[in-house]
């Protein structure tokens, strides 16, 4: 197949404002030609499906990579929302005379598309992942949850990354997770604990972001599997170790071994083993 886009650096039409490879993050118009498309997607999701979106923007990859963030919800509702999201995006794209793809890696040598999964556990009205006295304001319960997900990360990939194309995305150098580790802001790690909002005022936002899943996966299976892995970590009190602040992409193999940082499966066959 081939991809044609007025935004792409290989465009021959001369009618757009092409972006260089991996230079598509938050561009302004006229380079970003898809703002009206995303606006329409957000309106349809909200008005016809009751799905609220936090924000939308152009993403790193060229040729029209977009991100629309769905507001958090209970697990089953969130999975329903993810499926509805795909349906809406594909149909609105058709109305705009375009084709939307959920392929994890449609363009070689450019960033792929993920389905980052954010999780928090609540007990009545209390977010059990929040503790103001702990590092990154992440509670011990939250640490154990991360430990469980890391413990089962290799097995999870068969569910979170179910196609051969999925593993074209999981390679170093494109902000995709490859290494089984956790951090506050490290995009080379599988787990991130967002920390840009701090304090008890934002306790409800404390969460774990699992960056491995991609949009080719089944969200019902992904959310269930990630939850099961995390709960296993809580049950067995699995420690995730220290958060990794350094860029793991730049570490040597010996440095990673010394730090106990393992890698995700390199292909679907290994994930299924």
Report the location of each language-model feature:
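Glycine-rich, acidic/polar active-site loops that bind/position phosphate-bearing ligands
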Residues: 1-273
